[in-house]
Swiss-Prot record:
GO terms for molecular function: 2 iron, 2 sulfur cluster binding; 4 iron, 4 sulfur cluster binding; biotin synthase activity; iron ion binding. Pathway: Cofactor biosynthesis; biotin biosynthesis; biotin from 7,8-diaminononanoate: step 2/2. [4Fe-4S] cluster binds at C69, C73, C76. One of its GO terms (biological process) is biotin biosynthetic process. It is an enzyme of class 2 (transferase). The gene is bioB. Its EC number is 2.8.1.6. Belongs to the radical SAM superfamily. Biotin synthase family. [2Fe-2S] cluster binds at C148, C209, K279. This is Biotin synthase. Catalyzes the conversion of dethiobiotin (DTB) to biotin by the insertion of a sulfur atom into dethiobiotin via a radical-based mechanism. It catalyses: (4R,5S)-dethiobiotin + (sulfur carrier)-SH + 2 reduced [2Fe-2S]-[ferredoxin] + 2 S-adenosyl-L-methionine = (sulfur carrier)-H + biotin + 2 5'-deoxyadenosine + 2 L-methionine + 2 oxidized [2Fe-2S]-[ferredoxin].
Length: 330
């Protein structure tokens, strides 16, 4: 017998209309075997409104500039305010990016993201000009590849330039419920600066990839608050990360979320965003371990493959086989 909150949530499957905030909070209190019923509903909603296996979204990223970031994000190994042991380097060469992008194409990945550490760019600097050149070269030499970017907070001029250079998606995460950003993530910039960047991107018709990170000390209600806040941003992709505690950061001793809590979060995200690509990013392999397959049957229709900015991921070939096996559940 279905839990009444899940039974009520089946209207999302029938109508395609998302949960209300109150309904999402009710589902957030579920536990035990009810979570499998919730996952089943989320999977059905994903298949009906966000496409089947053929629309599964896999992407790879490259850390093109690493470390020495002046922002004090509490979870991040690249912040100079933290003491994580990572490789530090300035912006890499165009050739280095091209090699990584070619490998992504060879692996059958359709989207490739260039990522840089740092606050962002309020104007077009010489470094930003180099990034634009990288984008142009990838378009020229790998025309089948969707080139994406994540360069931090952007002003009007850099956003307009990215639009002119044909960027496919721009990633900038909200991370947590906006009114908790300075408490849980960073004090050197605000959630409002990120939201302003998203609005600029959408004004220039750039598709936005924006999600967050769970397990950083937020309450269950605040976790739902993040998912609700994302509804107002007109997003193409929602990547959700599960905190991977990194030594040398303020969150290194954080208690990891249970697989059940992660499952519940992703399933509720699908019911709040029936038509959006929902991507499992960091934490899929390291935090979910044996349960990551279950997550992919709980409304998720995309993942990051081949590794993250400062942590390793699973082999792309293994992920391709994994994605193909999901077709059995469509």
């Amino acid at each position: 017998m279905l839990h009444p909150a899940i039974e009520s949530a089946y209207r999302v499957l029938a109508t395609g209309e998302p949960l209300t905030h109150g309904e999402a909070l009710q589902l957030a209190n579920l536990s035990g075997s009810d979570l499998l019923d919730l996952a089943s509903l989320a999977h059905k909603v994903q298949l009906r409104y966000a496409g089947g296996v053929e629309s599964f979204h896999a992407c790879s990223i490259m850390n093109a500039k690493s470390g020495v970031c002046g922002e004090n994000c509490r979870f991040c190994a690249q912040s100079k305010h933290n003491n994580a042991a990572i490789e530090v380097y300035d912006l890499v060469s165009d050739d280095s990016v091209l090699i990584e992008a070619r490998q992504a194409v060879a692996n059958g990945v359709s989207h490739f993201g260039i990522v840089t550490s740092g606050y962002g760019y309020q104007r077009i600097t010489p470094e930003f000009e180099r990034l634009l050149g990288m984008i142009d070269r990838l378009h020229s030499e790998l025309p089948s590849l969707n080139v994406c970017a994540s360069f931090g907070v952007l002003g009007e001029e850099p956003v307009a330039a990215l639009a002119a250079h044909g960027i496919a998606h721009y990633n900038i995460n909200l991370q947590v419920e906006p009114n908790r950003y300075n408490d849980l993530i960073a004090t050197t910039h605000s959630a409002e600066e990120r939201i302003a960047t998203i609005h600029r991107l959408r004004q220039h018709n750039i598709a936005v990839c924006c999600g967050g990170i769970i397990g950083v000390g937020e309450s269950v209600e605040e976790r739902i608050g993040l998912l609700i806040a994302l509804q107002a941003l007109d997003l193409a992709v929602i990547p959700l990360n599960v905190l991977v505690p990194i030594a040398g950061t303020p969150l290194e001793k954080s208690e990891p979320l249970s697989a059940a809590e992660v499952l519940k979060t992703f399933a509720i995200c699908r019911l709040l965003h029936p038509r959006t690509i929902i991507k499992f990013a960091a934490g899929r392999e390291t935090m979910m371990k044996d349960f990551q397959g279950l997550l992919m049957l709980a409304g998720v229709n995309g993942f990051l493959t081949g590794g993250y900015l400062t942590t390793r991921g699973r082999d792309v070939a293994d992920d391709q086989r994994f994605a193909a096996q999901l077709a059995s559940f469509a």
